[in-house]
Amino acid sequence: MSYSGFRVMADSTPTLKKRLSGRSLYLVGMMGSGKTSTGRPLAERLGYGFVDADAVIEQAAGCSIPEIFERDGDAGFRSLESQVLSAISQRHSLVVATGGGVVTQPENWGLLHSGIVIWLDVVPDQLLQRLNADSTVRPLLQTTDPEASLNALLNERRPLYSEADLTVVINDETPEAVADGILQLLPSLLQDPTQRRTD
């Protein structure tokens, strides 16, 4: 199920929270797609807890994500990421901002689908603009041609992201507007579970 363009929520948030029955919401998408900035207001509106998986990984490793990549490589980082996701999935009533590459490990999908997976699909031009304005060090973009690297990653991951239960296409909406759009879309998914993972 996909959604683009946001309008006023039809279902009240308390009713929606009850219908979710404690299922966590996992936000997936490329780096810079706004998973953390959208996740916080989404969690606040639902009365859920918020978890930034990358922050938990850094806490567990005792160093930054770029340092983990430098020390342990991509495979080492992905292993730690899966361990952290497994621990997070034991809890409920959370909005979880995941790392951009969490979808690349098949074993993570069983954990993600313990809740509802929401893909924040930012149009490529907007994504590049966001990343250029962001001072965060992105290990996978430390190349001579970051734009080409970003496009290659997006092409590789797009089929994986499309396995999400909900797809929200984002242009230049604010994180708060995206959070409201997700809340507007969720009742349809909960009403008809057969719509999960369809576009």
From Swiss-Prot:
UniProt subcellular location: Cytoplasm
PROSITE patterns: SHIKIMATE_KINASE
EC number(s) stated in the UniProt entry for this protein: 2.7.1.71
Predominant subcellular localization, coarse grouping: cytoplasm
Enzymatic class: transferase
Biological role stated in the UniProt entry: Catalyzes the specific phosphorylation of the 3-hydroxyl group of shikimic acid using ATP as a cosubstrate.
Protein name as catalogued: Shikimate kinase
GO cellular component: cytosol
The keyword tRNA processing is annotated on this UniProt entry: no
Residues the record lists as binding Mg(2+): 36
Signal peptide interval: none
Cofactor detail note: Binds 1 Mg(2+) ion per subunit.
